[in-house]
Amino acid sequence: MKTHRIFRNAFFASILLSGALFISSCEKDDDGDMNDDTYAVAGDASGAQENPAVTTSGTATLSGTYNSSSNKLDYTINWTGLSGAATAIHFHAPASVGVNAGAITDLTISTNGINGQSKGTVTLTEEQEAYLLNGQVYYNIHTLLYADGEVRGQVVTSDN
């Protein structure tokens, strides 16, 4: 009976020790870095980047993240100084700087006016993901005065 108690206590002690070793071997990821499959996305837009270029005081800035595991692109675009309210916002691809391409997705206008915001999430196809990661996606904001686009910005990614 005493032998049974010794083995039982030794068994439970080994389980507790194993658990303690497991927990102590885990490393807390508190360095602020994103996962290996998450990329920061950004892009500044101006009329000079449109093709052909347009004269406007409007500008825009895109920021967000792209997760290559889920193919989800979370974005926020803020613009100021447009000639009027935005009529449409799109991502376009495949295109390098200065080259035009067709729209690949419409973006939601959250707050509209000469100053405004577009915020949302889009799911990219594998082909669109390749365009994004190779710097071949741009966004542009259309207005009544500039139906083909008043400001344009190339989207760049960086893995963190």
Predicted regions located by residue number:
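Bacterial N-terminal signal peptides that target proteins for export
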Residues: K2-A13
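Bacterial Sec-dependent N-terminal signal peptides
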Residues: K2-T3, S18-A42
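Transition segment at domain starts
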Residues: G32-S68
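Divalent metal-coordination and catalytic microenvironments
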Residues: L62, I89-A93, Y139-I141
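Aromatic sugar-binding surface patches on proteins
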Residues: N71, I114-T123
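Acidic glycine-/aspartate-rich tracts in secreted/extracellular proteins
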Residues: G81-S83, P94-V99, L144-Y146
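Solvent-exposed serine/threonine-rich low-complexity stretches and specific carbohydrate-binding patches
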Residues: I104-N112
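Short, exposed beta-strand-loop hairpins at the edges of beta-sheets
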Residues: E129-Y131, V137-Q154
